Amino acid sequence: MLQPKRTKFRKQHKGRIHGEAKGGFNLNFGSYALKAIEPERVTARQIEAARRAITRHMKRQGRVWIRIFPDVPVSSKPTEVRMGKGKGSVDYWAARVHPGRIMFEIDGVNDTIAREALRLGAQKLPVLTRIVAREDW
């Protein structure tokens, strides 16, 4: 699964996801892409599940690019632990996804396979998405 090799600090504040994506809203690599249309935090496990679903439907033809990276540490306390005694340990890593952000790009397969693969990948993600093609630009 994806996670940073090194970080400046071990833990971060929760934060909020405000506004549109400031970058990463154009197709740079592939012909078809999965674009987020709402703000959400996507975990490394969800990214990996979507990647597997996409590559499995493409039957290892073509190429997949992951355009988001989980760089936000999410901490949690164990169950049945009282409040206080500091912040919990890092549980998983997540990526903050803004509306308009391209999350996955694929190329090298025909239109129907590409759209179905991205639809299957979108089902694994907690964010509303739209499938976009290079012809739409």
Curated annotation (Swiss-Prot):
InterPro entries: Ribosomal_uL16, Ribosomal_uL16_bact-type, Ribosomal_uL16_CS, Ribosomal_uL16_dom, Ribosomal_uL16_sf. PROSITE patterns: RIBOSOMAL_L16_1, RIBOSOMAL_L16_2. This is Large ribosomal subunit protein uL16. Signal peptide: none annotated. NCBIfam families: rplP_bact. GO terms for cellular component: cytosolic large ribosomal subunit. It comes from the Bacteria. Coiled coil: none annotated. GO terms for molecular function: rRNA binding; structural constituent of ribosome; tRNA binding. Binds 23S rRNA and is also seen to make contacts with the A and possibly P site tRNAs. Keywords: Ribonucleoprotein, Ribosomal protein, RNA-binding, rRNA-binding, tRNA-binding.
